[in-house]
Amino acid sequence: GVERGLEFHSLSKSFNMTGWRLGWVCGSAEWIARLARVKSFVDTGPYLALQHAGAAVLDAAEPYLERNVAHLEARRDAAVAAFRAVGFDLRPPRAALYLWLRIPTGEAAREFALRVLEEQAVVLLPGSALGEGGEGYVRAALTLPADRYEEAASRVARAL
């Protein structure tokens, strides 16, 4: 491992810092030096204050992660219950921030997602946008407060 590869990590999802472009990389000193050289030609890194914020988050990571996981699990459980209540058969994700909903009408994923957006003002990603295996599914992001999923699921169901 460490002699032949690099391992990348991000603060984006675990610490709700999407868009900050903060993370770290693990590997041998030789490979880290090579990466630093390439990075020096590409960009100068995130704003220093953001880097300090990221370091502060890592210093207090454990209690924050426990609260964040509980929050995300509640959001996931609310979304799964809401979509199941309107007839979707789905498995709860173990770690992802998304639900995969099989389109029961057989409609193409892109057309269904566009129709739900236009008719019900709910944004779903067509599974086909992520590859052939995604056709027949839409992806719902678990980014809403837990109390909003019942309404979102009802709107999607009205589009069926």
Task: Name these PLM-found stretches.
Residues 1-160:
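PLP-dependent class I/II
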